Swiss-Prot record:
Catalytic activity entry: 3-phosphoshikimate + phosphoenolpyruvate = 5-O-(1-carboxyvinyl)-3-phosphoshikimate + phosphate
PROSITE patterns: EPSP_SYNTHASE_1, EPSP_SYNTHASE_2
InterPro entries the record matches: Enolpyruvate_Tfrase_dom, Enolpyruvate_Tfrase_sf, EPSP_synthase, EPSP_synthase_CS, RNA3'P_cycl/enolpyr_Trfase_a/b
Protein keywords: Amino-acid biosynthesis, Aromatic amino acid biosynthesis, Cytoplasm, Transferase
Pathway: Metabolic intermediate biosynthesis; chorismate biosynthesis; chorismate from D-erythrose 4-phosphate and phosphoenolpyruvate: step 6/7
Gene designation: aroA
Sequence positions that bind 3-phosphoshikimate: 22-23, 27, 173-175, 201, 316, 339, 343
EC number: 2.5.1.19
Homology family: Belongs to the EPSP synthase family.
CDD domains the record matches: EPSP_synthase
Protein name (Swiss-Prot/TrEMBL): 3-phosphoshikimate 1-carboxyvinyltransferase
Subunit structure: Monomer.
Annotated organism of origin: Histophilus somni (strain 2336) (Haemophilus somnus)
Keyword Transferase recorded: yes
């Protein structure tokens, strides 16, 4: 297996231009494909998950031109539901941001009835999709499980989504609601969605609603508990759509600065539609100096204090706090993060396991993690297993800010969202 050893870093200094957000990139591509008109999507992320979406759209008859550097995509919208040859199979890797929204969009009524199979890597077949399928079936969608109930692969027939009252469980993933919201306006009737349980990762729903509005569709909602969507609408191309920098990816650089230096990250700022921009506020609560601009966030180190906080609203960026906690004074508790367990891997167990290898004292609860700090000279060198999870690889790069080197196994797994992460991290790492 490929390994990457990072030597101890004495300080962090520099500026990072963020690649496009994964969540926004795949939403933008799907909305552009479904819309009337041609859309130029700029600052698109070039990564595995985006390639799976692009390949699926091509197989579904969508024409697009991708620039040589793969960051600009001109998409010719089809102005409604997808059409495809019966018997199509789409392989979506481990890309939840492709699997969930496509599963809903492919239920929309086509001119001729066809079946499509959605499948992916073994881990994708372990990632739950039952809450979305249950909701789609309430609207009249025709979806079957091909292997295990509640999990991909799925067989979908484009017989239509007929609106009405739909209940959806919001407690596992906001992507299920995102998928339903994005498909609903193209359905045959008006839809009222009621959320059961606590809706996790609300800021990701804000992203979805903001993007739908950019493509001409307004959704009414009542405190995130009920959503009203008119049927028989069309998305209208905004002609150009700029994908914001990935706020989750910003978290590693901002945390590195909070621990040992100063970094300016461009591509997101105070007006970002991504909830993970709030990660910078968490660093500020821990004691870091944070400066906000229109399109940048700057963080400078200061003495960090541990925190005890519900981080349900920023689950991806919260992982970075688990590492930052080692460098703070006092314990840190990250709460209400059960959905870490249904991501690319079971992130709660994975992070607890790898932190212990470093010598950290960690308590793993069902939906929380409690972490005690470590003195810089008390870190043990460890080989960090990454579980084919891009965010674990990026998080644990921060261990090099201690007095000990760290070895990351399978560093190439960052290709899911940030193929050049380690070279960017190296640029801001100073050793004198």
């Amino acid at each position: 297996m490929e390994k990457l050893t990072l030597s101890p870093i004495s300080r962090i200094d520099g500026e990072i231009n963020l690649p496009g957000s994964k969540s926004l990139s795949n939403r933008a591509l799907l909305l552009a494909a479904l819309a009337k008109g041609t859309t130029q999507v700029t600052n698109l992320l070039d990564s595995d998950d985006i390639r799976y979406m692009l390949n699926a759209l091509k197989a579904l008859g969508v024409n697009y031109q991708l620039s040589d550097d793969k960051t600009v995509c001109v998409v010719e919208g089809i102005g409604g539901a997808f059409q495809w040859q019966n018997g199509l199979s789409l392989f979506l890797g481990n890309a939840g941001t492709a699997m969930r929204p496509l599963a809903a969009a492919l239920c929309l009524k086509g001119d001729t009835e066809s079946e499509v199979i959605l499948t992916g890597e073994p881990r994708m077949k372990e990632r739950p999709i039952k809450h979305l399928v249950d909701a789609l079936r309430q609207t009249g969608a025709n979806i079957q499980y091909l292997e295990n109930d509640g999990y991909p692969p799925l067989a979908i027939r484009n017989q239509g989504i007929f609106g009405g009252k739909v209940q959806i469980d919001g407690s596992i993933s906001s992507q299920f609601l995102t998928a339903l919201l994005m498909a609903a306006p193209l359905g045959e009737g008006d839809m009222e969605i009621e959320i059961l349980g606590e809706l996790v990762s609300k800021p990701y729903i804000d992203i979805t609603l903001a993007m739908m509005k950019d493509f001409g569709i307004n959704v009414e909602h009542y405190n995130y508990q009920r959503f009203l969507i008119k049927g028989k609408q069309y998305y209208i191309s905004p002609q150009t759509y700029l994908v914001e920098g990935d706020a989750s990816s910003a978290s590693y650089f901002l945390a590195a600065a909070a621990i040992k230096g100063k970094v300016k990250v461009t591509g997101i700022g105070r007006n970002s539609i991504q909830g993970d921009r709030l990660f910078a506020d968490v660093l500020a609560q821990m004691g870091a100096k944070v400066t906000w601009g229109e399109d940048f966030i700057q963080v400078e180190k200061s003495e960090l204090k541990g925190i005890d906080m519900d981080m349900n609203h920023i689950p991806d960026a919260a992982m970075t706090i688990a590492i930052t906690a080692l460098f703070a004074q006092g314990e840190t508790v990250i709460r209400n993060i059960y959905n870490w367990r249904v991501k690319e891997t079971d992130r709660l167990t994975a992070i607890a396991t790898e932190l212990r290898k470093l010598g950290a004292e960690v308590e793993e609860g069902e939906d929380f993690i409690r972490i005690q700090p470590l003195a810089l000279d008390k870190f043990k060198h460890a080989e960090i297993a990454t579980y084919n999870d891009h965010r674990i690889a990026m998080c644990f790069s921060l261990i090099a800010l201690s007095d000990t080197s760290v070895t990351i196994l399978d560093p190439a797994c960052t290709a899911k969202t940030f193929p050049t992460y380690f070279s960017e991290f190296e640029k801001i790492s100073k050793n004198q």
